[in-house]
Amino acid sequence: MKNIIITGASGFLGAKIYNYFNSNNLVCSVGRSLNNNVICDLSTNIPVFSNIFFDTVIHCAGKAHIVPRTQKEVNEFNEVNFVGTKNLIKGIDSIPKLPKSFIFISSVAVYGVDEGILINEEHVAKPKTPYGISKKLAEDYIIAWGKKNNVKICVIRAPLIIGKDPLGNLKFMIDNIKSGRYLNIDKGRARKSMVLAEDIISFIPVLIKNEGIYNLTDGCHPSFFELSHLIAKNINNKTVHNISITFAKVLAKIGDFIYFFFKIEMPFNSLKLKKITASLTFDDSKARKIGWKPNCSLSKPSLWLD
């Protein structure tokens, strides 16, 4: 395995993938910042691969999942995640020899569900959010291109990706537990799938030899209770408090009320409450058939907690 193109090498997962493969392979990064080998804003331009030949593409670049507040933010999901993917492939099409394999970091958001237990790859993908829609469009485009050009396509549908210096919801939880502001709701019963970044990275050599769509999880699907208490234990035994579902509903209604009458977006509302209290887990048994053996986030906190 040699000559790898990586997009999104400055991102949370992309940077870790770049560092892992750059020690033993000729890796070429594509992105907007000046430290990339090929400098290109994929959302607006087609990259030029002059005298660069590669066997594998690992496409990590993308706009992360947030709740868009403006139409501009909605449009950015399509521009970065879908148009950016099309531009990348247009650039690849211009080289004399196409790569043998293409790995795309997608998301479980393509399923379009907020609640469910052990959802597998056969579940119909009907994304509802701009983020999920843009990822599904990118998936379809890549898969069709791969079939047309005899390139192995592997799509990773990932839940929350965790690791050192996390972003998003996990960072929010850790920061609030540190400050003593975190509260579990309804005893933190809801379970969510997640996956360690290091496990995804170490599995990529296997994925390069395969093709298809794979859910990747840690197989533990921790509850908010388990996760929050593990974090608290590792942060000087901080105490994690709990509020009842009844009280949480009252707070959520207040958030709804403020937005309805004053158009002020509150950090907690009924939609947020539903997501926090609903279990959402994914089945990774398809990946296990080709050698996926992840670490459990609950038993290996040293891999993602400082």
What is the role of each PLM region?
Residues 128-154:
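Active-site Tyr-X1-5-Lys
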Residues 111-112, 154-172:
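Flexible, glycine-rich beta-alpha linker
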Residues 36, 42-80, 87:
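NAD(P)H-binding glycine-rich loop region in Rossmannoid oxidoreductase-like domains
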Residues 87-130:
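Conserved Rossmann-fold NAD(P)-dependent oxidoreductase catalytic core, especially the SDR/UDP-sugar
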Residues 4-22:
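N-terminal Rossmann NAD(P)H-binding glycine-rich loop of SDR-like oxidoreductase domains
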Residues 282-306:
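Amphipathic terminal alpha-helices
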Residues 207-267, 303-306:
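Mid/C-terminal beta-alpha module of Rossmann-like enzyme folds, strongest
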Residues 166-172, 186-211, 215:
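Substrate-positioning beta->alpha
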